[in-house]
Amino acid sequence: MNWITNYVRPRINSMLGRREVPENLWIKCPETGEMVFHKDLEDNKWVIPASGFHMKMPAKARLADLFDKGEYEALQQPKVAQDPLKFRDSKKYTDRLKDSRVKTDQEDTIVAGVGKVRGLKLVAVVHEFNFMGGSLGIAAGEAIVKAFERAIAEKCPLVMFPASGGARMQEGILSLMQLPRTTVAVDMLKEAGQPYIVVLTNPTTGGVTASYAMLGDVHLAEPGAEICFAGKRVIEQTIREKLPEGFQTSEYLLEHGMVDMVVKRHDIPDTLATLLKILTKAPANDVSAKSLNGAAAPLVANG
């Protein structure tokens, strides 16, 4: 062995050898196939620049983007029983929870915070879809109820950003019990005279759609979001008929009066601020139509 084999050859091999590239370095647009560098996607609020396709946005990133200067008080995750049913399918439920916590750096699917949007104080609640599909379980239900209680105590509006596959099957009937619990929480906020706005994101389905996601005073939706109770494939297999093109999308639901506005992600903070000033009866000179005019679709009155 000599310096050629000890030094030169390893250097050449390292230069010519295959380098490992992280899987998430480039993101592919599901609509056009365009490849976008992950940093560019994050800087553009997880919206594909060319196609305008709205990718799923991490919950903490959404809160930071929503609140003025990214500043807010994070609400603590309530302590609840872990795996009360001792559920196990192909994998232990506790192991699924551990994997999701490592993946998302969250205790469960709900992240909530108190802060200001264009100077207006509010509580925001966001689902993290990457945590077991944003499913609604005991922990998520308790976090949502606590967020509503905080909004009532602070005498401020609450804005919900659902992104969920529905009730968490690993918690059975205990998961389904969160539907009436969260519904009661919505009623409590309305009785307190505070507005409740829902921003429907992709996807919003199942028991979440059947409860607090469709109980807002105003419903906004991001472009192209899937919003439904049962999925398109399940319905088609049940009725044995082909459903219309674009069925269960934000735009389809807007046309049929199920949502009030379809709003691009970049316009959401301004639109929320304008709507909340109207709903809270702020002085007329404080209310601007600028954000509403910049929305993807006009405000539609239902009924």
UniProtKB/Swiss-Prot annotation:
Full protein name: Acetyl-coenzyme A carboxylase carboxyl transferase subunit beta
What reaction gets catalysed by this protein? N(6)-carboxybiotinyl-L-lysyl-[protein] + acetyl-CoA = N(6)-biotinyl-L-lysyl-[protein] + malonyl-CoA
Q: Which GO terms describe its biological process?
A: fatty acid biosynthetic process; malonyl-CoA biosynthetic process
Where in the cell does this protein reside?
Answer: Cytoplasm
UniProt source species: Rhizobium rhizogenes (strain K84 / ATCC BAA-868) (Agrobacterium radiobacter)
Q: What does this chain do?
A: Component of the acetyl coenzyme A carboxylase (ACC) complex. Biotin carboxylase (BC) catalyzes the carboxylation of biotin on its carrier protein (BCCP) and then the CO(2) group is transferred by the transcarboxylase to acetyl-CoA to form malonyl-CoA.
What positions does the domain CoA carboxyltransferase N-terminal occupy? 25-294
Q: Name one GO molecular function term.
A: acetyl-CoA carboxylase activity
Cross-referenced NCBIfam families: accD (TIGR00515)
Membership in a protein family: Belongs to the AccD/PCCB family.
* Assembly behavior: Acetyl-CoA carboxylase is a heterohexamer composed of biotin carboxyl carrier protein (AccB), biotin carboxylase (AccC) and two subunits each of ACCase subunit alpha (AccA) and ACCase subunit beta (AccD).
